[in-house]
Amino acid sequence: AGLVGGGHIPKPGEISLAHHGVLFLDELPEFKKNALEALRQPLENGYVTITRSSVTATYPARFMLVAAMNLCPCGYYGDPHKDCRCSPQQIHQYQARISGPLLDRIDIHIEVPAARYQELSSNLPAESSAQIKERVNKGRAIQRERFKDERIICNAQMSHKQVKKFCALGKEENELLKMATTELNSSARAYDKIWDCCEIQHKYNFRPITCVFLASYRFNSL
């Protein structure tokens, strides 16, 4: 109830409180299975419906989901410096807590290695918050102009028809996208998301092989 909302008298949960914002879920597999599966409707439609015996309530829930998880219970599966203590069955069961349909609604999947001492103690300059803000504002401005005559406000809300309308790729890019998604046996939803990301990169020093690179963001060891 705390995540999606509920109670005897329905109240909005965290996903509705994060409407038009960012919802960060750490240790994703540790959430209850039914709570995770309840995320599928709002991630798809931007709202959540809660039904109780005497009342049905619908709350807005269009948010950006950012989730983090280990790949196994001990946390060291895939670590090049420390051995994993989990059995193959334990690893499979742990990763299986995140269903395929839920993973399919998460646009980008990235494995992040643990930061080492040399990286943490480095004096090399990092991108500042002001620079990141500038990039975000630039992206938002592009989307506002793109969707000024539509009933959506960002790329993530595009339908398949709108992806085809706004995300024009060249012949070579289309062929690479087709090859990548066929080899990876991706769903129609994943195809649209990769297509959208390819078009975005097309505006920033895009190369055809980027389609294959972006497709890899949809598929990791899960």
Give the predicted meaning of each segment.
Residues S16, E30-F31:
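Extended, folded domain segments that form the structural surfaces/walls around functional sites
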